[in-house]
Design a protein with these regions (language model features):
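Bacterial N-terminal signal peptides
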Residues: 12-22
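Residue-level hotspots at or immediately adjacent to binding/recognition sites across diverse folds
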Residues: 4, 9-11, 24-358
Length: 358
């Protein structure tokens, strides 16, 4: 399922133009790396979510298909599809190993799904969202959040609980997306306001609260929330995006990784307040243009980060220099401090990996 056109454009602006709650040791934490693998015949895997039992949800892919997967007990298994196509994508996992995401029908409409006890169930609310839906988060009470496409352009956040789906509405604009939910049932995401600006929201006890943004920011988005209600995401600052923490009613600008001037976003926070995310470095001029020759650039690239001692630290500096992997993003951190990441291999294959503290 695709973002609504207007929401996607605004989020592209936030990303491209785009402290710590707990005390941390002054010594940088280093990590061991585990490749979560892919299904037989596939050479690509993408990470989605990680629980504190060491289970991870993701997607295994090749040139023509992608299948949602569950990594558990050292093995990766297919969790299948809803049957119409060979495309399914996991987005989140809870502490019981239940996985949510979306699948596609033969008519190319996305349907939210729940995978539980070895079975994938279609939870698409067709009456609310006839144009498609995607599940993005699940808590340990089996409450599921996501968004549905209500027409040709606009998405609305939803909550699925007890077999019933509720449209959560917006902050006054046309669009909203629910991206995460904690065990207290608090939901976070982002929505357009009546003026068309993207703002982070917190939905709790039937009410959507606008979390606003710090003074000088151009917008905000909330991507994750922990058990104590701390929220992470991004804010638009001075033509870039910065990773951000919202706690106790206050936004904290976490900045970006040194040199990553194209921006950063915080994607995960555990119950200890440890934060991870992704930052983007600009292209670098290698050879200036000269008569008969074009300028050469090192392409823009992304890295995963963890916040240590108040700074965003490139995770590539915290693993073995001969690992054979380049970490391109971190998508979540569990309560053991294990970090789920995306990475590329020496052969440029995308892989889901887990970093375990040494």
């Amino acid at each position: 399922m695709k973002l609504g056109k207007n929401m996607k454009l605004r989020l592209m602006v936030l990303f491209a133009t785009g402290l710590m709650a707990g005390a941390m040791s002054s010594q940088a934490q280093s990590y061991n790396l585990t490749d979560l693998g892919a299904l037989p015949g596939d050479n690509i895997s993408y990470p989605a979510g990680l629980n504190s039992q060491g289970q991870a949800a993701g997607t295994s892919a090749n040139a023509t298909s992608g299948i949602a997967t569950l990594y558990s007990d050292g093995k990766v298994i297919s969790i299948g599809t809803l049957g119409a196509t060979d495309l399914s994508f996991a987005q989140a996992i809870n502490g019981s190993g239940q996985v949510v995401g979306y699948d596609y029908t033969s008519s190319d409409v996305s349907h939210a799904f729940l995978y539980s006890n070895g079975r994938m169930t279609d939870i698409h609310p067709a009456s609310l969202f006839p144009n498609g839906s995607s599940a993005q988060g699940i808590n340990n009470s089996d409450q599921i959040v996501g968004y549905g496409w209500i027409n040709g352009a606009d998405d609305h956040a939803f909550l699925y609980s007890g077999g019933r789906t509720v449209d959560l509405g917006t902050l006054g604009g046309n669009e909203s997306m629910a991206l995460a939910i904690n065990d207290a049932g608090q939901i976070v995401g982002h929505s357009t306001t009546a003026s068309g600006v993207v703002h982070a929201f917190l939905y709790s006890n039937g009410h959507m609260t606008d979390l606003g943004m710090p003074s000088g920011a151009a917008g905000s988005s909330a991507l994750a929330i922990n058990r104590t209600g701390q929220i992470v995401g991004l804010i638009g600052i001075n033509g870039s995006s910065h990773a951000a923490l919202y706690s106790g009613g206050v936004w904290t600008d976490l900045g970006t990784v040194a040199g990553a001037t194209l921006g950063a976003v915080a994607t995960g926070i555990n119950d200890a307040g440890e934060i991870v995310g992704q930052a983007t470095f600009p292209k670098v001029l290698i050879r200036p243009a000269s008569p008969g020759k074009r300028a050469l650039y090192k392409p823009s690239f992304r890295v995963g980060f963890v916040v240590q001692n108040g700074a965003l630290v490139d995770l590539n500096t915290l693993i073995s220099t001969n690992s054979g992997y380049a970490i391109t993003g971190a998508v979540g951190i569990n309560d053991l401090g294990e970090i789920l990441c995306s990475a590329t291999t020496a052969s440029s294959a995308s892989r889901a990996i887990v970093l375990t503290p040494k």
